[in-house]
């Protein structure tokens, strides 16, 4: 007798799918207006110079320009000078005065209303300052957090902001800095890559900020004749700090040779299969001949890496931070002009595919949150802040395993610097203290986890369809975002979200504390994610 009837009856129901995919650019008719990432990035004027310098580094016989370089007089960079910009706000007219033209253009197209500007002009300036620091360039982000044995290659920006009525200043702000970009208005920040199959194949990335050092303070401006109340005033004082010397290409290559493994990876790995091509290189899957383990190998042409010195940090630190909930670094090799980085491979793709294509229940969301909190508790206990928690950076195994990846914005906290202030990450997931340029600690990751939980509920983070600059303003001023249908959530889930999305950093839960939250006790087995992963993979395949 045939068992076909039984087979059909026993087959589990298909996972609930979203009526329309929330994936930006995945066949949406509105993709053209929402997918800012599809816009071409501006050309990098320094790319040719950097390539030429790198060619000279790896080809010692090339001395074409050395004589000319020697003939040039050495002129040191200016130091200890100040550039003061006065930006005022007239409460009567509702207009900013003395605002740089670049900022004025950004504000004009930001969709931040006049009433919103009048309500909180300081927040407007905060987000303009932040947005300007997030210039998009053709740069790759690396796992650039530092450990005690790795040199800090990041230049430092200092930012102090105080309101007219206040005397204390906000703690200093430190930003990563590149040395060759005066900057034009940046293109709109992409909400997320057009289609995230896996972060291994992701080519749309948020770069590290490239801005001059700023020291910003506020002071009153002269009131208008007919206005008895002085308007809010903001004086921006910019002081150029000395930059740390950058490593030469020769030094970078020498250091890399001392770090990477010796030998031919083509003998250690077999069955190479190309799975992705990005701006920084090509990604393959391969098989470890000795163990049979499937791995991901990213092959990067060093000539095309704009911040080669950060690769050293990446490798040094990745091998120091291994955890079951982190996509682990396995090995690295120099092969000709290429750096090969071998990583753990997860075939299930990113959590983004699941949240945009399927509907997760609370038990499944709790399981993902638990795994992410375990990764964060490990990182935070090792003084590492991830700074870019979002669904794109969570990889899934076909067995339902959940692992955190993409440490390009990580920061190491030293005892001397218990809080960081670098403006990095992806705006829609950012904590308010980051957007408003305050010093921050590991709990910025907890806020981002809360936003990611909203992603799992609604398919996208709050404000994703807003102009990015207005989204930053809303994050800075609205506080905890509102859910579309909070009544559909259990009380313990709402409490978990409130603990993650607490504006007061002191009251916000830590990773260690939240691992004890009652919400995680309803977590389903990780295997419950497998049908969602399979359904999402099928849906994304059909969207291509």
UniProtKB/Swiss-Prot annotation:
The modification Phosphothreonine is found at residues 84, 184, 211, 218, 224, 228-229, 422. Residues 1-77, 161-193, 212-250 are annotated as: Disordered. GO terms for biological process: actin cytoskeleton organization; apoptotic process; branching morphogenesis of an epithelial tube; cell migration; cellular response to starvation; chromatin remodeling; DNA damage response; exocytosis. Its main location: cytoplasm. Autophosphorylated in trans, meaning that in a dimer, one kinase molecule phosphorylates the other one. Activated by autophosphorylation at Thr-422 in response to a conformation change, triggered by interaction with GTP-bound CDC42 or RAC1. Activated by phosphorylation at Thr-422 by BRSK2 and by PDPK1. Phosphorylated by JAK2 in response to PRL; this increases PAK1 kinase activity. Phosphorylated at Ser-21 by PKB/AKT; this reduces interaction with NCK1 and association with focal adhesion sites. Upon DNA damage, phosphorylated at Thr-211 and translocates to the nucleoplasm. It is an enzyme of class 2 (transferase). It catalyses: L-seryl-[protein] + ATP = O-phospho-L-seryl-[protein] + ADP + H(+); L-threonyl-[protein] + ATP = O-phospho-L-threonyl-[protein] + ADP + H(+). It comes from the Eukaryota. Residues 75-105 are annotated as: GTPase-binding. The modification N-acetylserine is found at residue 2. SUPFAM superfamilies: Protein kinase-like (PK-like). Residues 75-88 form the CRIB domain. Residues 269-520 form the Protein kinase domain. Residues 70-140 are annotated as: Autoregulatory region. Residues 219-230 have a biased composition (Polar residues). It is found in: Cytoplasm; Cell junction, Focal adhesion; Cell projection, Lamellipodium; Cell membrane. Residues 174-183 have a biased composition (Acidic residues). Its cofactor is Mg(2+). GO terms for cellular component: cell-cell junction; centrosome; chromosome; cytoplasm; focal adhesion; lamellipodium; nucleoplasm; plasma membrane. GO terms for molecular function: ATP binding; collagen binding; gamma-tubulin binding; protein serine kinase activity; protein serine/threonine kinase activity. Phosphorylation of Thr-84 by OXSR1 inhibits activation. Activated by binding small G proteins. Binding of GTP-bound CDC42 or RAC1 to the autoregulatory region releases monomers from the autoinhibited dimer, and enables activation by phosphorylation of Thr-422. Homodimer in its autoinhibited state. Active as monomer. Interacts with GIT1. Component of cytoplasmic complexes, which also contains PXN, ARHGEF7 and GIT1. Interacts with NISCH. Interacts with DVL1; mediates the formation of a DVL1, MUSK and PAK1 ternary complex involved in AChR clustering. Binds to the caspase-cleaved p110 isoform of CDC2L1 and CDC2L2, p110C, but not the full-length proteins. Interacts with ARHGEF7. Interacts tightly with GTP-bound but not GDP-bound CDC42/P21 and RAC1. Probably found in a ternary complex composed of DSCAM, PAK1 and RAC1. PANTHER family: NON-SPECIFIC SERINE_THREONINE PROTEIN KINASE, SERINE/THREONINE-PROTEIN KINASE SAMKA-RELATED-RELATED. This is Serine/threonine-protein kinase PAK 1. It comes from Bos taurus (Bovine). The lineage of its organism: Eukaryota, Metazoa, Chordata, Craniata, Vertebrata.
